[in-house]
Amino acid sequence: MTALTLAPCDLVVADLGGTTLRVGRITAGTSEVHDVKRVPTNGLGRYGALAPQELQDRVMEQLTREIAAHLTRPGQAPAQAVAVSFAGPMTADGVVLAGPTLWGGPAAPLPVADVLTQRLGLPVVAANDVTAAAWRYAAAEPEPFCLTTVSSGIGNKVFRHGEIVIDQLGYGGEIGHWLVDHAEDAAPCECGGRGHLGAIASGRGALFAVRAAAAADASAFARSALAGPSGGVPEAITNEAFAAAARAGDTFARESLRRSLRPLASAVSLLFTAIGVRRYLFVGGFALALGDTFLTLLGDELVRVGCFGLDEYATRAMLALGEDDDDHCLIGIGQLAAARLGAPRAVEVTA
């Protein structure tokens, strides 16, 4: 019989984050990324003294250079398209509105897809990084789901009826900037605000909180598994040691983590109550480093907050971790590019 399928398409995929730029190759529609190169991003983290516009230019020069180097590889067909995952809010037509972790303050709106198309001479698909990560799970998750990344910050996207739920101008999916602490001295957010969810429940926020707790209660800190690795110095506590202590059941670490996760539980409860999504996937370095401990403590707090109409079992069943790797954005942007660029063609297949 004759069926429609997508012609294979070799892509260069890139994930531009505030800390690291990852570039690799993928066949659109597959989940196998290869020839991945990781380099420090030439942005705010490395050149913080430069003006935002200069940093934006520097980042785009680096992105163009690294992608161009992957267009042709020994023993492989030339790439036919490019797909880029970008750490920042983006409009539906690929214009980056801000890059707080990349170039900090205000810079010109960046039509990243158009710029790269002009420079590289190939079709380019661009999307926000959390949007890209959500696309990795689109085929495997038959029901609507919310993907949340919990790393140095927090971001989310809801995938429903085959698309990401965001406004054409890119609004939506920025739950990390939801105000949850109204105190004037609340934890600072990278956007310049204070008391945002991402400043409290992220890996960075949770580390800030456990260090503050250690400084405030020296005796409890001294009894904690965190005291040894840090030499008894609160500011020497690391995320790695914090996650290890929490996984091992250390009371001090777990209670501090629990407090940090409470506003995230409130966010999940709000999303469920508002739009009825019953599947929440969590990725990001901090969440995945904590593993089942993250789900247990977040589940405890979600049960305490409550999800209207659900019992404890159904409430906890909504939470799950994504794959334990750092390829979410590379794989996901490849899947998104296949959906946008893949041209259907008729092929003969055996029934």
From Swiss-Prot:
InterPro entries: ATPase_NBD (IPR043129), ROK (IPR000600). Involved in the biosynthesis of the antifungal agent validamycin A. Catalyzes the phosphorylation of valienone and validone to their 7-phosphate derivatives. One of its GO terms (biological process) is antibiotic biosynthetic process. Disruption phenotype: Cells lacking this gene are unable to procduce validamycin A. It is an enzyme of class 2 (transferase). Keywords: Antibiotic biosynthesis, Kinase, Transferase. Pfam families: ROK. Its EC number is 2.7.1.214. The keyword Transferase applies. Belongs to the ROK (NagC/XylR) family. This is C(7)-cyclitol 7-kinase. The lineage of its organism: Bacteria, Bacillati, Actinomycetota, Actinomycetes, Kitasatosporales. It comes from the Bacteria. Gene3D superfamilies: 3.30.420.40.
